[in-house]
Curated annotation (Swiss-Prot):
Induction: Induced by growth on methylamine, n-butylamine or benzylamine. It is found in: Periplasm. This is Quinohemoprotein amine dehydrogenase subunit gamma. GO terms for molecular function: oxidoreductase activity, acting on the CH-NH2 group of donors. It comes from Paracoccus denitrificans. The modification Tryptophylquinone is found at residue 43. There is a cross-link at residues 7-16 (4-cysteinyl-glutamic acid (Cys-Glu)). InterPro entries: QH-AmDH_gsu_dom, QH-AmDH_gsu_sf, QHNDH_gamma. The gene is qhnDH. Its main location: periplasm. Contains 1 cysteine tryptophylquinone per subunit.
Length: 82
């Protein structure tokens, strides 16, 4: 299925649904989904546009089996606030 949207000429909805909006033909085999990467303008919706790292996020939680409850959600500051 082809549709012209921006620079892309392929329709590859990702792993959530197949080209018909269903899930019956996915991952059969798993490598079949990788063929969508061959299009030069292909970019999956699951890839983030930006990446933020928080090096101190896991401080004090050295043993993940015991300390996983210490890990908290990270809420970045909004732009312009200090």
């Amino acid at each position: 299925m082809n549709a012209l949207v921006g620079c892309t000429t392929s329709f590859d909805p990702g792993w959530e649904v197949d080209a018909f909006g269903a899930v019956s033909n996915l991952c059969q085999p798993m490598e079949a989904d990788l063929y969508g990467c061959a299009d030069p303008c292909w970019w999956p919706a699951q890839v983030a546009d930006t990446l933020n790292t928080y090096p101190n996020w896991s401080a004090g939680a050295d043993d993940v089996m015991q300390d996983w409850r210490k890990l908290q959600s990270v809420f970045p500051e909004t732009k312009g606030s200090s």
